Amino acid sequence: INQWLKTTLGAGKTVAINPDMISINGYKALESELKAAGLNIYTEFDFINAIWTDRPAMPQSKAVVFDETHCGQSTADKLTALRTRMADANANTLLLTALDDIALLFNLRGADIDYNPVLIAFGLITDKDATLFINPDKLTDEVRAHLDKAGVKTADYTEVKPALSALAANTRIAVDPVKCNYALYKA
């Protein structure tokens, strides 16, 4: 695609990219290659929502607690171990975007993606707090109790970008640049 863009558009043209649909690494590689060819990148307009007017709603499966007898460790214990690794990596915040990582850390399962026991969510773990960004309609009383027991707060799925923007300037955030989208990275 990069080669086609460079050949077809030529220097001085602009390529619009939806930053929610490209990883950090993917964006940086694309940006480097296109800038070298004299092309610009524009990420400020969600053109997908503008043209895809009959887009299906987000999946709404209910979250289910994956019992720790099956996974061997409580969510609280996993968070403690994760915070130790974060400190070793000199990070005081971790943004989780991979759905399987979120399911494993929070001991939750769902059916939002066919043939994968995951929920559409984000996780934001700091040295003191953990927040699961998820549609609140997915949370049963059992799931809320499970998360409360582990000290995990919940927030609406759509609040992740404002939460990232509100972090202090000196926050050291760890992300997986292969899995995290560029829009969250920019937030």
Question: Model features per residue range: what roles?
Answer:
Residues 1-187:
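A composition/biophysics-driven feature that prefers long, compositionally simple stretches
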